[in-house]
């Protein structure tokens, strides 16, 4: 039996050793195929997805190897799965062959619907996972909430530093090139499926983890992949986890040096933890426009606030105005969204592009 603790990850890669057997399955979830929601749902049933990125030779293997032999993995009641989120890395075939003979869960999506979502991918300007901080003296609400950018530009490439304020239909033309590297992030599957042809493969349509179907799908998967059945009372399984609201929240409103208030989503692909000793003050605000919104602050901050009635009223008015602006911005961004019909219309007007893209799909479907 191999003692992985005595072998450096870099040497294990050179020796072609399979990864340590401390994971239940492999999840092959390409981008814009519901991967963020799937990852969050799995976490809710006690499965943590071990993701690894990087193009360089062996980088993903080494990262996963080191985690699997760490105390964070060994001394943990959670279960783990390896997540493959793209196929853009050196010696990808070797990486796949060094995975254990485990079940493989593959998430699928209608390719035109996936292309639509690819075009619509949003971040907030200061970074997807950054918590935006707002000073209560800043009353330019339209500017505060105008933070969304569309990160797939007309060349089809991902640019986290973009200033692009609208989704680009022209990126379809770039993505119709069969050699475009972004196809390895959202289309290319066949090579991976070929590697795992001797494994047990479970295919899931993304629409099976939307709304009421989510619970049934997770219950079915729990019996196949050996994880806990979902809690039927957990509302997260019925929520839309990725939306403009997800991009713009959470944020922190700084009232003064003693009071900070958090505005967040109750359910999100982002893992928002309500800080210990915080209290939910959502019901204090009349402009709450979505059941997913939650407003909270540390109890001592709230005690300090209610002891100053003038300041308390100022905060109520400020956050209500902020919420009105937030709702307005969300509607603006929703109206920018490219629809499936827009994608099909683009193909109708650009026949050569449509043919090239169809050739790519024919190769993969």
Predicted regions and their residues:
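PAPS-dependent sulfotransferase catalytic domain
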Residues: 1-235, 243-275, 279-281
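PAPS-dependent sulfotransferases, especially Golgi type II membrane carbohydrate sulfotransferases
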Residues: 1-18, 224-365
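Extended amphipathic secondary-structure runs
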Residues: 25-28, 40-41, 178-224, 322-338, ...
